Structure formats: C-alpha cells, structure tokens
C-alpha cells in the first residue's frame, strides 16, 4: 500500500508510517514426528482385530524397516533385486535439475515376512490390487494409523511420516549414527557435492550398517 500511495521522488507521502513495523512474524518450527524405541516396539507387537488396521500397522513397520522410505516411493516399488530393494527417491527427482537420488536397502530378516505376505506372485501386489493410486492408499493407511495410535494410547496423530522421522531420530540419538550418514540413508541431496557424487561409487554398506544398528535396538529386552 505504501508503494502504491507514496512517491518519495516527488515528496508525496500519503502513508508516513509502516503499519506493520511492530508486527513480528513467528519463526516456523517444524513439528517433531518421531516416536521412541518402545513405541515402535508396541506398534510392531500389537494385535488388531480389524484386518485394515493390521495392514496399516504392517505398512508402517515396512516403511520403518526400509529406512523411512516415503509412501509414494513405497507404493511404486516394483521388485526386489538380490535381496535388496532399490528405487529412486521421487521427492528429489525433477525434470529441471535431474537430482535423481538412487537408494538401495538390504532386506533385513524383520522385513522379509512382511514382503512375502504382501507379495502374491508379484512384488507387493497386494496394495496395487486394492488401491487404484497412491493417494487412495495413503489416505486409507493414515486413517487406520490414527486408530493404531488411539488403541495403543500413543497420544499422537500417527501417520506414515512418523516412520521416517522415527527411524532418523533413533538412528541419530540411540544408534549413534552420524548426521551425514543419516542424511545419506534418507536420500537427501547434498548440493555441495552433487558433481563429485557423479564420479564416486555409492557405498550402500553405510546404509546397511546404519539400518541394522537401528533394528537391533528393537530386539533389546524383548
């Protein structure tokens, strides 16, 4: 408004003061969506009468076992290759910058029975046979995860994002994994080294060790 009504070049000042000078815009603080180890174990071990709720819990645990893979990438998984799940993180894949982030996750023993259960001839075909697209799948799973949280008394609005945040938090705080390695496992692009990454072979053993360390924490005091 001041730019519209004022013209400092001709000393025309119709609005002398800035009405927003005392307005303080609060800093955006991202809400934490991480669960402690005990809560993850409770989700894993819970029994649900409703098969849809049990399915949502299984999806949550698969996301966690796959180092916090996001739901869009999970729904798009097509196969398993020599005991590994490989994909390119869709969030960082753009036509403009070609920032493809290839990830490879070793199938750990905790994940194996779930993959087998939901693969009927074709890898994870169970979900694609029942849900027409990713958005319907996401909506259905998140709806049931709210019931999981309510039944277990977790006190949070549980959603699929919590699997990713929880894996990262446990890896850093409990498993002692360095932040740089956690970022690598999550598929975060490092713009400072993007060109160097083109020429460097990716060492996924970093991910294997980190994920194994996190999953081993779920086995303690069982």
Region locations from a protein language model:
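C-terminal catalytic core of tyrosine-transesterase DNA break-rejoin enzymes
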Residues: 61, 65, 69-72, 162-188
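Short, charged phosphate-coordinating catalytic segments
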Residues: 2-11, 63-84, 180
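Active-site/catalytic core of tyrosine-dependent DNA strand-transfer enzymes
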Residues: 40, 106-155
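Short, polar N-cap/turn motifs at the start of nucleic acid-interacting alpha helices
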Residues: 80-86, 155-156, 176-198, 219-222
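Short, leucine-enriched amphipathic alpha-helices that occur as contiguous helical runs
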Residues: 55-57, 138, 142, 164-165
């Amino acid at each position: 408004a001041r730019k519209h009504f004022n013209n400092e070049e001709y000393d025309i000042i119709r609005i002398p003061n800035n009405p927003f000078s005392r307005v303080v815009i609060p800093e955006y603080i991202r809400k934490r969506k991480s669960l402690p180890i005990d809560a993850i174990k409770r989700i894993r071990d819970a029994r649900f009468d409703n098969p849809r709720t049990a399915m949502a819990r299984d999806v949550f645990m698969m996301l966690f076992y796959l180092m916090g893979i996001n739901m869009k990438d999970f729904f798009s998984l097509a196969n398993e290759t020599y005991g590994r799940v490989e994909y390119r993180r869709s969030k960082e894949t753009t036509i403009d910058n070609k920032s493809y982030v290839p990830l490879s996750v070793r199938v750990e023993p905790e994940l194996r029975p779930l993959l087998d259960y939901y693969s009927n001839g074709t890898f994870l075909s169970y979900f694609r046979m029942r849900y027409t697209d990713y958005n319907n799948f996401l909506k259905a799973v998140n709806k049931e995860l709210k019931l999981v949280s309510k039944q277990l008394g977790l006190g949070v609005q549980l959603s699929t994002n919590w699997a990713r945040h929880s894996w990262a938090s446990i890896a850093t705080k409990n498993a002692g994994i360095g932040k740089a390695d956690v970022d690598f496992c999550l598929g975060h692009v490092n713009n400072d080294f993007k060109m160097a990454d083109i020429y460097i072979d990716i060492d996924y053993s970093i991910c294997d060790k980190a994920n194994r360390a996190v999953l081993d924490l779920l086995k303690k005091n069982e």
